[in-house]
Amino acid sequence: MGACAMNPQALKGSAMLAAAMLLASGAAMADVAPQAKAPTIAKELQQAKTYTISSPPTAPLEMAKPALPALSGYTDAAMEKKIVRAKPGKISIRRMMQEDALKDFIGGDNKMAEWVVRQHGIPQAIFIDDGYMNLKDLLGKVPKQYLSETSPGVFLAKLPIVVGRKGILEIDKKTQELRLSQEAGSFLINDGQLFVRDTKVTGWSEKANGPALYKSPKEFRPFLLAWGGTETYISNTKMASFGYANSKSYGVSISQYTPNMAKVLKRPEPTGWIIDSEFSDMWYGFYCYETTGFVIKGNTYKDNIVYGIDPHDRSHGLIIADNTVYGTKKKHGIIISREVNDSFIFNNRSYDNKLSGLVLDRNSVNNFVADNEFYRNHTDGITLYESGDNLLWGNKVIANRRHGIRVRNSVNIKLYENTSMANGLTGLYGHIKDLTDTDRDIALDPFDAKVSLIVVGGELAGNGSGPLSIDSPLSVELYRVSMLAPTKSSGISFNGVLGDRQEEILDLLVRQQKAVLIDPVERQTELQD
């Protein structure tokens, strides 16, 4: 689709750009003129004098690229094998009160009023329990005022549909489209096993006789939520017009139960796969909370409202691969935030998003970000906030409006063989920031105002204000980094603490082809292993 058409162009453009800059920069790499220092950076110069420049051995920097997880097992055929159809399920219509899976939507703050108004009475839901049910089988078993076939294969649901703890619901190609009524307050809850394959599920406005298109954050729109202990599998499906600004109602959400309920229910973390599907006009394209091993592969997330893909709190072991994310209207294409650890983000394309292409945020550590393309995002290509011990390898970060790669308050960030080119500001920008006077909850999201980087290989070329700027680093190690001139200058210039020692650094890095270690004199702190 859009991505396929645009991707080769972006890469072709970057190759042409590189060739043009090689010609334009001429001997920029061999003959770098030190720039006159403006008086305004006196403080930086004073800091710079407290750093030593040395050439460490290169052997410890030579690292083989870690293996990425195989994706061949995550297929529709493998999904099909997981469906147990042996035991027919039971269907009932029950009141929404007293149901664990619905407590979050019924409890305090007069939450029940929403459903009373939409259903014109005591709120009810359709429940599938104790076995397998195909959505088409619900017809005839559920009164027509709650679920009807409006044209062949097109179903309109006017109540929430809940897959019970031992329930299995399959929505497949027998369903051309499932429409969840916005006016009647329909949504989909998985508390068991849910399979959505070869179909279409849409938040539907009966009034407009069309999708429940986004109008405002607080306006109810149908959504899908899977709770703790569940498995959710979606393949070759189009989902659109889900979600709004209300807890767990964001679009497609996979979430452990809330802490108080989780203590009582003791259900394991939820999991599942979403493959080869398309999500558009969602408040969040994907959200998860305390989720394990979830796979998001080969999907398109386009024109969603706040985020495309948003794994959150303490989710881990995720695979986010081969996705195309573009046109996110309010924030980032992909963001992992608050202790989302030990995950793989690779072979994705994220472009034309309102803020960054990818963000690693709030102490998300030990993640491997490889072989992605982040381009034409309206702020940074890749942003790391307060998230140390991450490895970025072989990413192409091109023509983003601000920095290519920005690293804030994050230590032991390893950047291998990345290309950061033609970005509006800096190719690679490392800095510290004191967040104590912000609205941040420091107990929930602690931070250290420290930054340290290892940069090996790759290319920093043609960025608007220079290849590299690092402010107050704990340490920086550079080796085999190719740098070409920024667009606004005849030669390379470093900003931040590197500026004062630029000639020394470039002599080692470019002319002598050695590694460079920039280390504060006062601490000489080693990078944490």
Swiss-Prot record:
Keywords: Alginate biosynthesis, Isomerase, Periplasm, Repeat, Signal. The keyword Isomerase applies. Gene3D superfamilies: Single-stranded right-handed beta-helix, Pectin lyase-like. Disruption phenotype: Deletion mutant has a non-mucoid phenotype. Mutant produces predominantly an unsaturated disaccharide originating from degradation by AlgL. Residues 1-30 form the signal peptide. It comes from the Bacteria. Its main location: periplasm. Belongs to the D-mannuronate C5-epimerase family. This is Mannuronan C5-epimerase. It comes from Pseudomonas fluorescens.
